[in-house]
Amino acid sequence: VTELHKRPWLVLAGLALGVTVTNGFARFAYGLILPAMQSDLGWNYAQAGWLNTANALGYIAGAVVTMLMIGRYSATSLFSFGLITTNLALLATGLIAELWWQTLWRVLVGFFGAMSFSTAGVLAAGLFPNDPRRNALAIAILFGTGGGLAIVLSGASLPLFLDHYGADHWPLAWVIIAAICLLFLPLCLWSAAKLKRPAPPQAKARAPLPISQIWAQLAGYAGFGLGYIVFLTFLSAWMTQQAASASFIAAVWILLGLSICISPLVWRAILARHASGLPLAMILTCIALGSALPVLFPGNISLLSAAVIFGLSVFMAPSAVTNFARQNLPAHSWGAAISLFTVVFAVAQTLGPYAAGLLGDLAGDIGISLLGASGLLLLGAVIALTQKPLPNPPRGQIAQSGKQE
């Protein structure tokens, strides 16, 4: 505990690198390696799409299992176990090319990644228990900078690596990613250990969540899951459809990642000030704008602007629901609440790309799918806007943060 008080930001850095592994490399690097895998292995779009679905199904299962286990095992144990196993699964992905092997490990990457990702928020929520503003910033850095770092590193290196060495070197790309994640592991595990606390009393751990009072926030977060993933899934395809060069595509991804990294600075005050659904509604509106902009106004400037707007907002949605849980629920309910939000998100993001793909096929233009995703995000924003702060919040937390609607 003494070391935590002395070096809380170093502890946060370890947690953020955990998100870099589980939410960055484990999920978004796949989209950059996939073209090489398709080219080398002769996969069709159905096979490539199946691996995305397999990963999402694993993520759902991992989120559900975490929700069931969070009352019995500490967040530290679940975070550490999920992180180690995600690292091993990333390494295994580069060993054998057969589709059944790739399916197995994409499922497990999703499963273990969800376990570590959802508990990272629980751990970060306890970093500054008596300083809501710093706590809001810490949670935003966890998801924003942690996830954005992986997109910057992946976007800057993977396309160039595969272009230089050839598509048949995709297995080595996975091994390199696993090696980088392995370097992060010691600090990640150290940070989690510094935040280890005794398991909560069983009676409290099993106390039901006030779902009837937080349904609007849950529905808004479902809209986030449905909409954001469409942009990230089809961004490269849309740019290719618009005849963008490989270097420009890489530049857009790097700009997107850098914007994600600095997004905590943009949203920290809003996240700390409001205990209602307003922060999530504002974030979803910005994501919707970023998704629609390149379709409504085609061109390089529009794409670069969309990358900035989308990047400054997209990873703040998990920060918004984590802060909402922290500001409105007692500490022993944070784990269950964040796990529930993760389950809702996981189911929604599984449906999003499939539905968007169907819409794009019917319309003959993937841009229609981006507009559809923008509409879902706006609907989620409207619903989230109706979320009010809960009555009887945890004593001391909201009063210090200047709770507003």
Residue positions per predicted region:
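A late C-terminal transmembrane helix in Major Facilitator Superfamily
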Residues: 326-365, 373
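Paired small-residue
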Residues: 89, 100-109, 301-309
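Cytoplasmic helix-loop-helix junction between adjacent transmembrane helices
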Residues: 105-145
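Helix-loop-helix hairpin linking two adjacent transmembrane segments in secondary transporters
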Residues: 98-101, 134-193
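Helix-to-loop junctions at the C-terminal end of transmembrane segments
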Residues: 62-74, 263-275, 360-361
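C-terminal transmembrane helical hairpin of 12-TM major facilitator-type secondary transporters
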Residues: 275-324
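Extracytoplasmic gate region of multi-pass secondary transporters
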Residues: 30-31, 213-264
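Conserved MFS/SLC helix-loop-helix module at the cytosolic interface between two early adjacent transmembrane helices
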Residues: 61-98
